[in-house]
């Protein structure tokens, strides 16, 4: 199966503007997050790769795995360096400092430019990349700014779903994009593998907190006819995903829109939380129960305490500080 992932991009002039409003809107300026940088948290991005030539990456060290070619050094195969944009939101060290700049980061190249302005991948390669994040990198969080279309079965057990289920059942957090087919073209389902119950499916919001027009709708009915239950209604959350400034190749910067960007905001928030609450990290023989607690805290952290779920807005918009506050009130996860 061929996956196509398309986001909106706009090259910005130097010196580039900043999108600090987005981090503020998502609750990253909350006092409860003071001093947290993601240190000691292992994050694995599966994307188009990364181009470290942007000066904002000076001093950044990553682990790189190439599922497309045989490069031993970091490379970005994507249209407009999609993976580089996503990584910059996390670990850029200058101009617009990333939201979790001290994480231990791995980037796996599994998507590439199809020559028509889209990034494509074979689902089997994406699944292999996720498996590498699990078995070789020992990730705490796997960040997937990508996705594929669900079949009529809606919970299709393709390779990406299977390996995502493997990850979350081991207590590894998977944050995945809900998809960019919102509006008239919406098929009413979030992308694969964000449809997996314990994965966190992320939609996009605008400046001001409204649902971005192309953010995908979720269905709450499983293939067997059963209904999803809290805290796993899809999508779970929205986060800023419109006109987000981040790193490109060389000294370029881009404005990007889509659920890809929104996914990274949730990944960053979760990295800060796991630094603060290391008992919530995956452990030997973890069974996913910590994820259940963290996702319930995410639901409760939204406006209204997650009492209402919307098929596009989820439980509401991310507020990183509120999420951490909810988790601090939980008992330790064993």
What are these regions (language model features)?
Residues 5-44, 68-79, 212-215, 219-223, ...:
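N-terminal domain-start motif of subtilase-like serine proteases
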Residues 32-43, 50-63, 74-122, 137-140, ...:
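Subtilisin-like serine protease catalytic core
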Residues 34, 89-93, 129-136, 145, ...:
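Structured segments of extracytoplasmic/periplasmic soluble domains
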Residues 47, 191-275:
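Extracellular S/T/G-rich loop segment that most often corresponds to the catalytic His/Ser-adjacent loop
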Residues 49-52, 67-69, 111-114, 147-151, ...:
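Solvent-exposed loop/turn segments at secondary-structure junctions
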Residues 108-112, 241-311:
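Hydrolase catalytic cores
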Residues 111-198, 232, 247-264, 309-312, ...:
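Substrate-binding/access-modulating region of protease and related hydrolase catalytic domains
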Residues 179, 320-334:
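Secreted peptidase-domain scaffold signal
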């Amino acid at each position: 199966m061929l996956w196509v992932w398309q986001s909106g991009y706009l090259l910005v002039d130097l010196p580039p503007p900043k999108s600090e409003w987005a981090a503020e809107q998502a609750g990253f300026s909350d006092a409860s997050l003071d001093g947290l940088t993601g240190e000691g948290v292992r994050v694995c991005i599966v994307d188009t790769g990364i181009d470290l030539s942007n000066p904002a990456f000076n001093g950044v060290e990553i682990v790189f795995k190439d599922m497309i070619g045989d490069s031993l050094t970091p490379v970005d195969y994507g249209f407009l360096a999609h993976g580089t944009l996503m990584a910059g939101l996390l670990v850029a060290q200058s101009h617009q400092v990333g939201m979790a700049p001290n994480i231990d980061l791995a980037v796996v190249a599994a998507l590439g430019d199809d020559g028509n302005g889209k990034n494509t991948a074979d689902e089997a390669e994406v699944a292999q990349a996720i498996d590498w994040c699990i078995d070789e990198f020992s990730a705490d969080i796997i960040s997937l700014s990508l996705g594929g279309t669900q079949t009529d079965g809606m919970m299709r057990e393709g390779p990406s779903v299977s390996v995502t289920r493997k990850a979350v059942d081991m207590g590894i957090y998977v944050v995945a994009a809900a998809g960019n087919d919102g509006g008239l073209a919406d098929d009413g389902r979030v992308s694969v593998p964000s449809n997996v119950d314990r994965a966190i499916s992320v939609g996009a919001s605008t400046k001001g907190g409204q649902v971005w027009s192309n953010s995908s709708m979720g269905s709450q009915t499983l293939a067997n006819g059963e209904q999803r239950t809290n805290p796993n209604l899809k999508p779970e959350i929205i986060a800023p995903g419109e006109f987000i400034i981040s790193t490109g190749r060389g000294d370029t910067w881009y404005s990007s829109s889509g659920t890809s960007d929104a996914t990274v905001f949730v990944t960053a928030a979760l990295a800060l939380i796991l630094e603060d609450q290391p008992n919530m990290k995956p452990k030997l023989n973890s069974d996913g129960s910590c994820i259940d607690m963290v996702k319930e805290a995410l639901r409760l952290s939204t406006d209204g305490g997650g009492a209402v779920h919307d098929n596009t807005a989820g439980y509401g918009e991310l507020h990183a500080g509120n999420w951490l506050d909810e988790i601090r009130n939980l008992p330790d996860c064993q």
